Amino acid sequence: GINTNEDNVSVTTINGGTLQINAGLGAEGDGIDSNGYLVINGGNVYATACEQGGDAGLDATLDIQLNGGFVVGLGNMSDTLSTDSQQEYMVFTFASTLPAESEVVLSDTEGASVLSFTTAKAGQILLFSAPNLARNVDYTPTVDGVTQQYTGNQAVGFGGGAPGEMDG
């Protein structure tokens, strides 16, 4: 994974490009781990944590801001996202762990896919952010064609306000 490790000082900023991170080939590891701030302003970011521990696709000690880009984080833990984020985001905690090589699709109420990817590793918590996410729209996650039950953070969030509820 990517680790910036000067405690409470580091600022990891992603402004563009494509990052595909498959972390923790050993016993642990977050996808992207900033011991300060993590700011994503653009690009395509796919961050998968180690499947063996309590690691996150995106992890920051102080704050995570999602301001743009297409972002997918998969792991077994999730850090709180900043209310200063400028882009919608969703965090799903699934009822059971998604196996590696699972096809994940997130669809809106019209059946249009807003996310489609195959997991590199197993994980239970999925974070997703993209410019085409909308507030007050119900999204349905499916894994290998089966609609998933999820708990916990069932929300579309956006900086500057409380997250909107999602049906699940």
Map each language-model feature to its residues:
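A composition-driven surface/loop motif
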Residues: G1-G168
